[in-house]
Every structure is written in C-alpha cells, then in structure tokens.
C-alpha cells in the first residue's frame, strides 16, 4: 500500500508541478519570498515549499489569504492536467476571494477568465469582490448571471 501511495503521489506531483508553479505565482503575486510554490514529496506526504526558501512548509509561512490562493492554484492545476472538457466543464468555488488581498484577487479573476472553463460558479458575500469578478468576466466577453441567494431565500420564505 505504501509503495502504491508513494507512486500515486509522485505521478500526481510530476503532472501538476509546472501548472502549480505558474498558477500560484500568478495568484500570490505579493509574496515576498518569490513567485511560485513548489510541491515535493517528503516522508510519504506532499509538501508545498516556497521556491526561494527550501525546506520550509508554506503552511507555516503564508497568510490565510495566500493559502487560499495556493488552494485555488492547486485546484486549477489538477483541473488543467486531469480535467476532461468532454464531460461536465464546470468550476465551483465557495468564496474564492475571501481573505485574499486586492492584487491577488485581480490576478485570480484574470486567471479564471483565461482558463476557457465552460461554466464558473462562484459565491461571495463581499459586494466589492463580486463587482470585481463581474467586471473582469464581462470585460473578457464572458456572460455573467448573478443571484442574491439571501434575497431568493427571503422571497420564498415570505411567499409561504
């Protein structure tokens, strides 16, 4: 089992390491230790390190917003490598811009517009970030549909 697990991790890592470096560098642009996060295998586990600070797990270095950016970079890397556009070409992310600084939010919005994903469903409770996403997506020629879930819920509750 341990050998199979290590082989799986190695295959996954080799497949996503370049997209992860690119996407994390684009999303976490204000990171003082350099652009991009490197993934390596240590003692049978996947570890993420800053490119310029070898041996340091980024979970001990990055802020919450930067870790959110890394999570999205990992998601996009896996989708880029293993995603099948012949199937359901959709991306769903709950509050992707939460705790992310403005520069990273703009970078993420730009990156999402360049992915060619059939449908992107995002949720956020921050109006300013929703406005940013709406602007970036419309500017990229993508159609945008917004739903205020609280208003929809209140409408159904008051109608009963």
Where are these regions (language model features)?
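Short beta-strand
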Residues: 29, 36-41
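Conserved ATPase-coupling elements of RecA-like P-loop NTPase cores
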Residues: 83-86, 100-106
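Conserved catalytic network of the ASCE P-loop NTPase/AAA+ motor domain
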Residues: 64, 81-86, 112-116
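C-terminal lobe/lid and adjacent interdomain/linker elements of RecA-like ASCE P-loop ATPase modules
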Residues: 104-160
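Catalytic Walker B motif of ABC-type/P-loop ATPase nucleotide-binding domains
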Residues: 85-95
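Conserved ABC ATPase signature
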Residues: 13, 45-76, 97-100
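Conserved helix-loop functional segments at active or binding sites
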Residues: 29, 78-83
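Charged, surface-exposed helical/loop "interaction arms" that form contiguous linear patches used
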Residues: 1-28, 32
